UniProtKB/Swiss-Prot annotation:
Protein name per the record: Phosphate acyltransferase
Record note on quaternary structure: Homodimer. Probably interacts with PlsY.
InterPro entries, per the entry: FA_synthesis, Phospholipid_synth_PlsX-like
Keywords: Cytoplasm, Lipid biosynthesis, Lipid metabolism, Phospholipid biosynthesis, Phospholipid metabolism, Transferase
Its EC number(s): 2.3.1.274
Reaction it catalyzes: a fatty acyl-[ACP] + phosphate = an acyl phosphate + holo-[ACP]
The keyword Transferase appears for this protein: yes
UniProt gene name: plsX
Physiological role: Catalyzes the reversible formation of acyl-phosphate (acyl-PO(4)) from acyl-[acyl-carrier-protein] (acyl-ACP). This enzyme utilizes acyl-ACP as fatty acyl donor, but not acyl-CoA.
């Protein structure tokens, strides 16, 4: 199995990418990795090149660039070349911690959309209080969704949750403003009716306040709603930790309490860090394309590689294609 990784994408590239890749190589004996980027910079951190190949390029896509234009103009950019490795059959999947928009464009224009899938979805695994997490899609790839798009997201998310996350008969919920049948706008009502007859374990509408309680294993929504929910959860978690830190540092006695509580607080912080679950998968493409968090450290990159390897090994893409074909959606 071979995975191509954009070594220049992310806030801590290439160091975090290289260290994460070496960690994955040690863990998985069947894995080969191609690091795409500036060879001189990559080799500064590469202490072992066992089953690691470097594809040199001086070009990269900056986060400030317009995504589609950058992908079309910069054919030799590290992210584009990683996607090209997949298209050419040189890699089974690709990963990048670079620009989300650029990776979506590279996925569509280079890797290609799966036949029958109208719009791809961006899907991270979000944390829950019990540590199991849930898959959420879409969180920004498609802000103007149609009912058929969300139907397809539900099927793809269900396959992923079962194959990669090991959840038998995963619960699929539709993010809505209430749990009762008939709630929501016209899009929600149409999708609800379609999902009731889908070949999945549809548990009905779910509200955003219940997401972290693990009300569903897969949560489906349009990209606009999903992105707002994602950013709200991120912001709330950061604000709570910030307020907690301020209170714990407010007096001598509270500082003593903080010293005692620190190990438990670090466990809690790690549990709420969704980057530990891997990256956000771009569902609906011909091969696995994973968006690692922009601030990924080496452990986050390792988690994204582990996730990608599971998607390839468990044949997630062929399974999705087969299910869609059975549903006469292709």
């Amino acid at each position: 199995m071979k995975i191509a990784i954009d070594a220049m994408g992310g806030d801590h590239a290439p160091k975090a990418v290289v260290l994460g890749a070496m960690k994955a190589i040690k863990e998985y004996s069947d894995l080969h990795i191609t690091l795409v980027g500036k060879e001189e910079e990559i080799r500064q951190y590469l202490t072992s090149d066992e089953r690691i190949t470097i594809l040199h390029t001086d070009e990269k896509i900056e986060s400030t660039e317009e995504p589609v234009r950058a992908v079309r103009r910069k054919k030799q950019a590290s992210m584009v070349l990683a996607a090209q490795q997949v298209k050419d059959g040189e890699a089974d999947a690709c990963i990048s911690a670079g620009s989300t928009g650029a990776l979506m464009a590279a996925g569509l224009f280079v890797v290609g959309r799966m036949e029958g899938i109208e719009r791809p979805a961006l899907s991270p695994t979000m944390p829950t209080v019990d540590g199991k997490g849930f898959v959420m899609l879409d969180v920004g790839a498609n802000v103007d969704a149609k009912p058929i798009h969300l139907y397809q997201y539900a099927v793809m998310g269900s396959v992923y949750a079962e194959k990669v996350r090991g959840i038998e008969n995963p619960r699929v919920g539709l993010l809505n403003v209430g749990t009762e049948d008939g709630k929501g706008n016209e899009l929600s009502k149409q999708v609800f009716a379609m999902l009731k007859d889908a070949p999945i374990n549809f548990v009905g509408n779910v509200e955003s306040r219940d997401l972290l309680q693990g009300v569903a294993d897969v949560v489906v929504c349009d990209g606009f709603t999903g992105n707002v929910a994602l950013k709200s959860l991120e912001g709330t978690a950061l604000a709570l930790f910030s307020m907690l830190k301020e209170q714990l540092m407010s007096s001598f006695t509270s500082k003593l309490a903080a010293a005692v509580l620190k190990p438990k607080l670090m466990v809690l912080k790690d549990k709420m860090d969704y980057s530990e679950y891997g990256g956000a998968a771009l569902f609906g493409l011909k091969a696995p394309v994973i968006k690692a968090h922009g601030s990924s450290n080496d452990q986050s990159i390792f988690s994204a590689i582990r996730q990608t390897r599971e998607m390839v090994a468990k044949e997630v893409i062929p399974t999705i294609s087969s299910v869609m074909e059975k549903e006469s959606l292709q």
